[in-house]
Each structure stands twice: as structure tokens, then as C-alpha cells.
């Protein structure tokens, strides 16, 4: 763990009609593995292809077709495990999860129930208010995705697209450590950030590449502590699972609704039924899908077509040695190396491209704090207005660093720098050359500034008298000098000269 000090957030407390209740949440996150081919076939994983165009015989469940494991899928699972500080199991095995669904042509899903490839790990989830929680990871296992059933193309029939069938998924299972809707969303967001840094999952929830099954239960204050002491899950209440959540906002909304639904049932004298539910974002409610299955309902058994998966420690060590710097480590380095605030470091490390852009600017400009200020406030602010991200920035790191270097050299003022940024953003060009060509260079000649100050003081004796009674009114003279020089006068020099001249009156 990083040596960072955070307070643990308090659990979400929901007031029922009769008493207070606390939330308990665990998540099963399904992350599509970033590979070009599927888990057990060479078929493409390209999103958006023509329906049923990325389907190998083994994906379609054709008789006699045997699965052959994709080594890169295994490597990506190992990378993810290492990124989550998890134990890597050198021996794992695949099992068949048997159930019928039209978009599952094999009649079973190949998964890892008994011997997953990754064991226990953890992830630090920061909530932005100075609090953070360490969420324990129970396991990560590899499994096949199912296809897609399409019900809205024809009123009389459904269609099946098998392009997604057999695509590799990592199922990341957390312990019931999450205590509120915001924590749940922050946890999924942090997992996505880590996997994007690792390059193991692109995290695009809108494409279904990252989905979460959310387990929700409620308990009375004090019961969670009993669970922690005994590891007896009965203290946590009966959980319901909300399937296939693909939006951070919907995850929070679904948890809020489901918790209140369960509280109402219990306080009315009923009992919560363990079941699988779906969230309807249009109605803002969850609805029953089916009774919650247990492992024995799926008749798991070892897949006879696949030998146990055995990997070598040396191979794992090679993967570990090649891991990139991860978000927590990068954030800590930005704070110490560049003197950034916790907030600024969090914003800049939210994405690898943001972090790389900032480092390039800071390195060339030689000023991390100034670089962070310009990247976050000016560049990100402007990009957000146009709904663009950093990869679409018309201002290169070298150009932004050039603007910052002109500020540091007192060649331009902060106001002129913003005008210059706008020119570079819309028209491009070298900042130094633009300043020279357009006469934007800051006036640093104290003689010229003194002359302007003398002229304004002489023309405004009444204002001078007011400023002598109230020194704060000296700012009026500063503004008049800046206006007279077209904003080109050095603000620091203007302030000093105005103060000195007024003192002499």
C-alpha cells in the first residue's frame, strides 16, 4: 500500500420509517479482456462488426470443435491481478457452467469456479473528500461472454448475434466491503482506471465492455461489525443481485432504490427474497428477474476439453517487471515531484493520456504547478466546452509549455497569456513568434510605466485623495494603467510603482 493517510468513510445510513439502516454492497465486475482474439478461438473481438461475422466454429458450439486457450487472455488476467496487488495462482482450471439460453450455443459457459487464475487482492478507493476505503478483492477468474439476443427488431421474433460469444471476460469479485452508492461507483471507476493504465480492458461501459452485477443488502447499525468479527454473513441481511449495470450513475440509483425497497419490506414485517433483479432507468426502479441461483443450480464440473492451466513464476515475474506505473503511484509521485495538490494530482492521473500530456508540459516548461494550472483550468476547460478530450487537443504540450515559459520570463502577463492561448488553440503557431509578430510582449520598461502612472495620478486628484484614505482603492490606478498600456504592462511593476507614487503624494 502507498503511504497515504485517509480517513475511512462512514457507512451510508438510510432512515427507515421505524429505524436506521446501513448498506452493504459487493460487486462482480465483468471486464472484457483487451485482446484481438477470443478466449478459446481466433475469431475477432472487434466491436460493431456485422452480426454473426466474428464467429468461429468453436464459438458456435459446432460438434467436434475443441477450445484452444488464448495465451494473451491469460497474460492480461495476470496483469490485472498484479495491478490489484493480488495473488497469482500458478495452477488454475476451467469449469463448465451449464444453463440454456438462445445466445449460448454450447449450452454451457466455460468459467473458473473452483480454481481461479487470480486470488485475493485489494484496491484503494478514494472518494474525493479526504476519505478512502480499501476494498478487498476475493478473486478474478476468466470466462466466456455470451452472445446477444435482440428482441426489438421484429414484433414476432427475436434475433441472436453471436459476435460476442466466446469473448474473454475477467470477473472481478469484491468482498462486501462497500458501504454506499457513491463508494460503489467510485470502486468501479477505480477498477476501470487501473485496467486502462494496464491496457487490460478499455472500460467502455457504453459498449458493454465493463458491466457490474451489484449485490445489495441492508443491516441494522452494529451488525456489520458483528460480521467483521465472526465472518458470519447472516449479519448482513439477505442480498439481492442487480444484473448487468453499465453506467456509474445507474449503479448509484439502483442501489438507492433497492436499499429502500428492502427496508420497506422488512419494516412491514416481511422478509427479503434472495433473487436476481434488473434496474429500469426509465422508471428508476428494480424489478424481479428470477430467483437467485446457487452454484449447484448450474451443475458445475471441470471442463473435460481443457487441461488445468499451469503457468510459471518466471513468466509472471516478467509480466510484473513490465507493468506500467499505476494510478496511485503516479499520483503520489506528482504530489511529491511537482508539488501538486491532492485534487490536481487526481485530475491529472485520472487517465493515462492526461498524465502523459501534463508530464510533457511540466518537463518542458520546468514548472509543475504552473503546468497543472494551465492544463486543468485552461486546456481541460476549453476542451470540455467542445466535448473533446485531451487526444483531440489542438494545443500540443510543446505549445502550452511555450506559453508558460513566456509567463515565467515576464515576457507576457497572465491576461495576455490567456489571449495567446486562445490564438494558439484556434489558429495554431509558435507562441513566442505570435507574441513577437502581434506586439503582445509585456511592457517591463519601468520608465514607460512611471510615465503612465504619473499621467493618471495627475489627471485624477480626487481619486488620489480617496486612495490615500483607503489604500485598497489603489487598485483603480493599477486598472487604469493596464488599460492605458493595452494590458501589456507588467502587473507586478505597475503595483509597485502605483504604491510608491501614491505614498509620495
Swiss-Prot record:
Q: What does the record list as GO biological process? A: glutaminyl-tRNAGln biosynthesis via transamidation; translation
Instruction: Quote the EC number.
Output: 6.3.5.-
Its top-level enzyme class, in one word, is ligase
Quote one Gene Ontology molecular function term. Answer: asparaginyl-tRNA synthase (glutamine-hydrolyzing) activity
Q: Which UniProt keywords apply?
A: ATP-binding, Ligase, Nucleotide-binding, Protein biosynthesis
Reaction(s) catalysed by this chain, per the record, are: L-glutamyl-tRNA(Gln) + L-glutamine + ATP + H2O = L-glutaminyl-tRNA(Gln) + L-glutamate + ADP + phosphate + H(+); L-aspartyl-tRNA(Asn) + L-glutamine + ATP + H2O = L-asparaginyl-tRNA(Asn) + L-glutamate + ADP + phosphate + 2 H(+)
Entry-linked SUPFAM superfamilies: GatB/YqeY motif, Glutamine synthetase/guanido kinase
Q: Do you know which Gene3D superfamilies this protein is assigned to?
A: 1.10.10.410, GatB domain, N-terminal subdomain
- In this record, what's one Pfam family? GatB_Yqey
Per its UniProt record, what InterPro entries does this chain match? Asn/Gln-tRNA_amidoTrfase_suB/E, Asn/Gln-tRNA_Trfase_suB/E_cat, Asn/Gln_amidotransferase, Asn/Gln_tRNA_amidoTrase-B-like, GatB, GatB_C_1, GatB_Yqey_C_2, Gln-tRNA_amidoTrfase_suB_CS
Q: Which family does it belong to?
A: Belongs to the GatB/GatE family. GatB subfamily.
HAMAP family reported for this sequence: GatB
The protein's role, per its UniProt record: Allows the formation of correctly charged Asn-tRNA(Asn) or Gln-tRNA(Gln) through the transamidation of misacylated Asp-tRNA(Asn) or Glu-tRNA(Gln) in organisms which lack either or both of asparaginyl-tRNA or glutaminyl-tRNA synthetases. The reaction takes place in the presence of glutamine and ATP through an activated phospho-Asp-tRNA(Asn) or phospho-Glu-tRNA(Gln).
Query: Quaternary structure?
Result: Heterotrimer of A, B and C subunits.
Record-linked NCBIfam families: gatB, PRK05477.1-2, PRK05477.1-4, PRK05477.1-5
| Name listed for the protein in its UniProt record | Aspartyl/glutamyl-tRNA(Asn/Gln) amidotransferase subunit B
Amino acid at each position: 500500500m502507498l503511504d497515504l493517510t485517509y480517513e475511512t468513510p462512514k457507512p451510508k445510513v438510510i432512515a427507515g420509517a421505524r429505524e436506521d439502516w446501513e448498506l452493504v454492497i459487493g460487486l462482480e465486475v465483468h471486464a472484457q479482456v483487451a485482446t484481438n482474439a477470443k478466449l478459446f478461438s481466433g475469431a475477432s473481438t472487434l466491436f460493431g462488426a456485422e452480426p454473426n461475422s466474428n464467429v468461429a466454429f468453436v464459438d458456435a458450439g459446432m460438434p467436434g470443435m475443441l477450445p484452444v486457450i488464448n495465451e494473451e487472455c491469460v497474460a492480461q488476467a495476470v496483469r490485472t491481478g498484479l495491478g490489484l496487488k493480488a495473488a497469482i495462482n500458478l495452477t488454475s482450471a476451467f469449469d463448465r457452467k451449464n444453463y440454456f439460453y438462445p445466445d449460448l450455443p454450447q449450452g454451457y459457459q466455460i468459467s473458473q469456479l473452483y480454481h481461479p487464475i487470480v486470488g485475493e487482492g485489494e484496491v484503494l478507493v478514494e472518494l474525493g473528500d479526504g476519505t478512502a476505503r480499501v476494498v478487498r478483492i476475493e478473486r478474478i477468474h476468466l470466462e466466456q461472454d455470451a452472445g446477444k439476443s435482440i428482441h426489438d427488431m421484429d414484433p414476432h421474433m427475436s434475433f441472436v448475434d453471436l459476435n460476442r460469444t466466446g469473448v474473454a471476460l475477467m470477473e472481478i469479485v469484491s468482498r462486501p466491503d462497500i458501504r454506499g452508492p457513491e463508494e460503489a461507483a467510485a470502486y468501479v471507476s477505480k477498477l476501470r482506471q487501473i485496467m486502462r493504465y494496464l491496457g487490460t480492458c478499455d472500460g467502455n461501459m457504453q459498449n458493454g465492455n465493463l458491466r457490474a452485477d451489484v449485490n445489495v443488502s441492508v443491516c441494522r447499525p452494529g451488525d456489520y461489525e458483528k460480521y467483521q468479527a465472526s465472518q458470519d454473513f447472516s449479519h448482513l441481511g439477505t442480498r439481492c443481485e442487480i444484473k448487468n449495470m453499465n453506467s456509474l450513475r445507474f449503479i448509484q440509483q439502483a442501489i438507492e432504490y433497492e436499499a429502500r425497497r428492502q427496508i420497506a419490506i422488512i419494516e412491514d414485517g416481511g422478509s427479503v427474497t434472495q433473487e436476481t433483479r434488473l434496474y429500469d432507468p426509465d422508471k428508476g426502479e428494480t424489478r424481479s428477474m428470477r430467483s437467485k441461483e446457487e452454484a449447484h443450480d448450474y451443475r458445475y464440473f471441470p471442463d473435460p476439453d481443457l487441461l488445468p492451466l499451469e503457468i510459471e513464476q518466471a513468466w509472471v515475474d516478467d509480466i510484473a517487471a513490465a507493468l506500467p506505473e499505476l494510478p496511485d503511484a503516479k499520483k503520489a509521485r506528482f504530489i511529491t515531484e511537482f508539488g501538486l495538490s491532492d485534487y490536481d494530482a487526481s485530475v491529472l492521473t485520472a487517465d493515462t493520456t492526461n498524465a502523459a500530456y501534463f508530464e510533457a508540459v511540466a518537463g518542458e516548461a520546468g514548472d509543475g504547478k504552473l503546468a497543472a494550472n494551465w492544463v486543468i483550468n485552461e486546456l481541460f476547460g476549453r476542451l470540455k466546452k467542445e466535448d473533446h478530450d485531451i487526444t483531440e487537443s489542438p494545443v500540443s504540450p510543446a505549445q502550452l509549455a511555450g506559453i508558460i515559459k513566456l509567463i515565467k520570463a515576464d515576457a507576457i502577463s497572465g491576461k495576455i497569456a490567456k489571449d495567446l492561448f486562445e490564438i494558439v488553440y484556434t489558429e495554431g503557431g509558435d507562441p513566442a513568434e505570435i507574441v513577437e509578430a502581434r506586439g503582445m510582449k509585456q511592457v517591463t520598461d519601468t520608465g514607460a510605466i512611471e510615465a503612465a502612472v504619473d499621467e493618471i495620478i495627475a489627471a485624477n486628484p480626487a481619486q488620489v485623495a480617496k486612495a490615500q484614505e483607503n489604500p485598497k482603492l489603489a487598485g483603480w490606478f493599477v486598472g487604469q494603467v493596464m488599460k492605458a498600456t493595452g494590458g501589456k504592462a507588467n502587473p507586478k511593476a505597475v503595483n509597485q510603482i502605483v504604491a510608491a507614487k501614491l505614498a509620495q503624494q
